[in-house]
Amino acid sequence: MRLSRYFMPILKENPKEAEIVSHRLMLRAGMIRQQSQGIYSWLPLGKRVLDKVNAIIREEQNRAGAIELSMPTLQSAELWQESGRYDAYGKEMLRIKDRQDRPMLYGPTNEEMVTDIFRSSVKSYKDLPLNLYHIQLKFRDEIRPRFGTMRSREFMMKDAYSFDLTREGAEHSYNKMFAAYLRTFERLGLRAIPMRADTGPIGGNLSHEFIILADTGESEVFCHKDFVGFDIPGENTDFDSVEGLKAIFDKWTSLYAATSEMHDEAAFNAVPEGDRLSARGIEVGHIFYFGTKYSEPMGAKVQGPDGKEHFVHMGSYGIGPTRLVPAIIEASHDDNGIIWPASVAPFDVVVINMKVGDQACDDTCELIYAALKKAGKDVLYDDTDDRAGTKFATADLIGVPVQIIAGPRAVANGEVEVKDRKTGARETMTIEAAINRFVA
């Protein structure tokens, strides 16, 4: 992508409305723009990051055996009345009526709808276990939306829903998502700690929040410091192994970890003082097991091996991609801007032409740009006529992991400079070596 033809409206000054680092940097880097309170447009740079986050989420959901579908954003109020949540959910749910005066709602979550899909299609235990997920925009009318897309009214959510014949089967499905979430966050460059959580309006009796530690987090968290060094389940994790996944779950829940809502001061004080960690954190995922809370009132049942009908046991599992993006920034930035993990960076490399119009610089940059694109890399080519300082500031602000800098003096010697955004380390190398480093 040539920067001269790209839409990336950079802000030079810090926006007054931004209270936290991620909101400020997302606005300055031209990733998002606010349309109304708590509602944002994702501009091209932000959309590229969001798409890469979603791709990793999809890969790990699929790896764990979940199956993707797509459900509508507008839902019938009748389904929510059937489950008993229509009146109980509160003012966060946006209620509307269509032209036939039928009550509808803009879905804040999808337990009722996915249960309706299940009950109309699945009749036998032989079709279980089943886990369905989708990635969709949702709306909750927050009283006080703040911090940009960290806590917005319209947001994107990956929500998965599992169906099992027994509680034991449902707990295995829960453990699958537990392990999948640990893998997902690690691939996004985050260390998330699972903490026992309140079930809230979703309901149920087993729930964990996944929290990353950050000074700007809304939650106060208390945990054993060893969580920071725990090994993440590997790519070869057997998601069909009941014992293997139970071992992962037991390991990650064996030490004390709780948000302020579930904090037990006495239990935390029992942790050796040198091992206690109290900090602030950001919730990036939430999983629930709620048994037959929805299947019973909505009649979601299957015929079991005994020939009798059984209400299915359910769980739900949420990750907010539009919340994850600012969370990654909160965890990875410096005074100059964002430092993206390579897995979600909008571009792999930015090629900076220090003197546009100089034939040697132009030819060198075109050569590198073409070679990296041919190798399948996402490349941003700064071919603008901005001053050198502006080019460097822009590259640092948007956080591309690698900068390849071509100036007249270096190019005359057949060389370019390569800068690592995270460490700031610079290395001069031949043009061929620079290309080979990133196409190998």
From Swiss-Prot:
<dbReference type="InterPro" id="IPR045864">
    <property type="entry name" value="aa-tRNA-synth_II/BPL/LPL"/>
</dbReference>
<comment type="subunit">
    <text>Homodimer.</text>
</comment>
<keyword id="KW-0067">ATP-binding</keyword>
<dbReference type="InterPro" id="IPR036621">
    <property type="entry name" value="Anticodon-bd_dom_sf"/>
</dbReference>
<keyword id="KW-0436">Ligase</keyword>
<dbReference type="GO" id="GO:0005524">
    <property type="term" value="F:ATP binding"/>
</dbReference>
<comment type="function">
    <text>Catalyzes the attachment of proline to tRNA(Pro) in a two-step reaction: proline is first activated by ATP to form Pro-AMP and then transferred to the acceptor end of tRNA(Pro).</text>
</comment>
<dbReference type="InterPro" id="IPR002316">
    <property type="entry name" value="Pro-tRNA-ligase_IIa"/>
</dbReference>
<dbReference type="InterPro" id="IPR004154">
    <property type="entry name" value="Anticodon-bd"/>
</dbReference>
<dbReference type="InterPro" id="IPR044140">
    <property type="entry name" value="ProRS_anticodon_short"/>
</dbReference>
<dbReference type="GO" id="GO:0005829">
    <property type="term" value="C:cytosol"/>
</dbReference>
<comment type="similarity">
    <text>Belongs to the class-II aminoacyl-tRNA synthetase family. ProS type 2 subfamily.</text>
</comment>
<dbReference type="InterPro" id="IPR006195">
    <property type="entry name" value="aa-tRNA-synth_II"/>
</dbReference>
<keyword id="KW-0030">Aminoacyl-tRNA synthetase</keyword>
<dbReference type="InterPro" id="IPR004500">
    <property type="entry name" value="Pro-tRNA-synth_IIa_bac-type"/>
</dbReference>
<keyword id="KW-0963">Cytoplasm</keyword>
<dbReference type="InterPro" id="IPR023716">
    <property type="entry name" value="Prolyl-tRNA_ligase_IIa_type2"/>
</dbReference>
<keyword id="KW-0547">Nucleotide-binding</keyword>
<dbReference type="InterPro" id="IPR033730">
    <property type="entry name" value="ProRS_core_prok"/>
</dbReference>
<dbReference type="Pfam" id="PF00587">
    <property type="entry name" value="tRNA-synt_2b"/>
</dbReference>
<keyword id="KW-0648">Protein biosynthesis</keyword>
<dbReference type="GO" id="GO:0004827">
    <property type="term" value="F:proline-tRNA ligase activity"/>
</dbReference>
<dbReference type="InterPro" id="IPR050062">
    <property type="entry name" value="Pro-tRNA_synthetase"/>
</dbReference>
<dbReference type="InterPro" id="IPR002314">
    <property type="entry name" value="aa-tRNA-synt_IIb"/>
</dbReference>
<dbReference type="GO" id="GO:0006433">
    <property type="term" value="P:prolyl-tRNA aminoacylation"/>
</dbReference>
<dbReference type="Pfam" id="PF03129">
    <property type="entry name" value="HGTP_anticodon"/>
</dbReference>
<protein>
    <recommendedName>
        <fullName>Proline--tRNA ligase</fullName>
        <ecNumber>6.1.1.15</ecNumber>
    </recommendedName>
</protein>
